[in-house]
From Swiss-Prot:
Record keywords: Cell projection, Cytoplasm, Repeat, Sensory transduction, Transducer, Vision, WD repeat
Function as written in the Swiss-Prot or TrEMBL entry: Guanine nucleotide-binding proteins (G proteins) are involved as a modulator or transducer in various transmembrane signaling systems. The beta and gamma chains are required for the GTPase activity, for replacement of GDP by GTP, and for G protein-effector interaction.
Family, similarity comment: Belongs to the WD repeat G protein beta family.
Protein name per its UniProtKB record: Guanine nucleotide-binding protein subunit beta-2
Cell location: Cytoplasm; Cell projection, Axon; Cell projection, Rhabdomere
GO biological process: G protein-coupled receptor signaling pathway; negative regulation of opsin-mediated signaling pathway; negative regulation of smoothened signaling pathway; phospholipase C-activating opsin-mediated signaling pathway; phototransduction; visual perception
InterPro entries: G-protein_beta_WD-40_rep (IPR020472), Gprotein_B (IPR001632), Guanine_nucleotide-bd_bsu (IPR016346), WD40/YVTN_repeat-like_dom_sf (IPR015943), WD40_repeat_dom_sf (IPR036322), WD40_rpt (IPR001680)
Length: 346
């Protein structure tokens, strides 16, 4: 590793000092903990999800899953070079979309269910219209969004005409899909962006990064509004709380955490019963009372968010869980894994 010159070291020290000051200011305003305030609340039942369906069709690691707004259909992306749209009620495939690049890392369904987007190591985001077929009978590609200098790690639709992406070049991009142009393009973090979650009202979003921080953004502006610290390793995934007043995050540092936007800091921390797994993806129930995280050991863990009590483990996958997604009505959880399976938990 090259030696850091004194001037650069001075800047590092100054930045670290500022960060520590932010942390100290936040800590000074923490007059109580969530556990203290919720100690007299009743316990929630142990999580009752069980693996009801296994969606088989991929022949390589499945890296991502996302539900459509109808809570019935979901899309998965795999290193076999295919997107598959599933009917989760019947476990049937609705469409199979072959990709030009097999290295897909993220997928997204538009809330309307009209479009899906994907991207990965091809350094671009590709959008398909699921209601229109090309000459070969597969969903028609309508946009190829290029200009990235790193892999695409996350993408989410605001609506059928607008998309937000995060990528390995540390950038956040906003796209007008009708025109096929970027409306915003800016550096979001000091490291690869790993996850992105939209607020319930679609006016703000949270990003997580390998720089160990999460940030709050307004969809209308470039600069972040708030920055959150706490994790000791990469922030793998973030998920907005259904109230819109907070969010959860998880990391391979073997913790998940809850942050309150109004308190401007972490309010809870969740750990597995045995500290033997890091986490790759997180989701909150529609009530916000349950937090679920997919683990690198192949299980989905659940906690009572208020009392910070572990409420169960969903077992079935045989390898690392890569992504989990809860359908909008909260009745089904989908998980993907390196074991090539997509599991539905009901």
């Amino acid at each position: 590793m090259p030696k850091i010159d004194p001037e650069t070291q001075k800047l590092y020290d100054e930045i670290n000092g500022m960060i520590q000051k932010f942390k100290d200011d936040q800590k000074s305003k923490a007059d109580c903990t969530l556990a203290d305030k919720c100690g007299d609340m009743g316990d929630v039942p142990k999580i009752r999800f069980s693996s009801k369906k296994i969606l088989k069709g991929h022949i390589n690691k499945v890296n991502s899953v996302h539900f459509a707004g109808d809570s019935r259909h979901c899309v998965t992306g795999s290193l076999d070079g295919k997107l598959i749209i599933w009917d989760t009620w019947t476990a049937n495939k609705v469409q199979i979309i072959p990709l030009r690049s097999a290295w897909v890392m993220t997928v997204a369904f538009s809330p309307s269910g009209n479009f899906v987007a994907c991207g990965g190591m091809d350094n671009q985001c590709t959008v398909y219209d699921v209601n229109n077929r090309d000459a070969s009978g597969v969903a028609k590609m309508v946009k190829e969004l290029m200009g990235y200098e790193g892999f695409l790690s996350s993408c989410r639709f605001l609506d059928d005409g607008h998309l937000i992406t995060g990528s390995g070049d540390m950038k956040i991009c906003h796209w007008d899909l009708e025109k096929g142009v970027k409306t915003m393009d800016f550096n979001g973090h000091a490291g690869d962006i790993a996850g992105l979650s939209l607020s319930p009202d679609m006016k703000t979003y949270i990003t997580g990064s390998v720089d160990k921080t999460a940030k709050l953004w307004d969809v209308r502006e470039e600069g972040h509004k708030q920055m959150f610290f706490g994790h000791d390793m990469d922030v793998s995934s973030v998920c907005y709380h259904p109230s819109g007043f907070g969010f959860a995050s998880c990391s391979e540092d073997q913790t998940a955490r809850m942050y309150d936007l109004r308190a401007d800091q972490q309010i809870a921390q969740y750990e597995p019963p045995q500290k033997n797994t890091g986490f790759t993806s997180c989701a909150l129930s529609t009530s916000g009372r349950y937090l679920m995280c997919g683990g690198i050991e192949g299980n989905v863990h659940s906690w009572d968010t208020m009392k910070q009590r572990h409420t169960g483990t969903l077992s079935g996958h045989e390898n690392r869980i890569t992504c989990i997604s809860l359908c909008p009505n909260g009745m089904c959880l989908a998980s993907t894994s390196w074991d090539q399976q997509v599991r539905l938990w009901l």
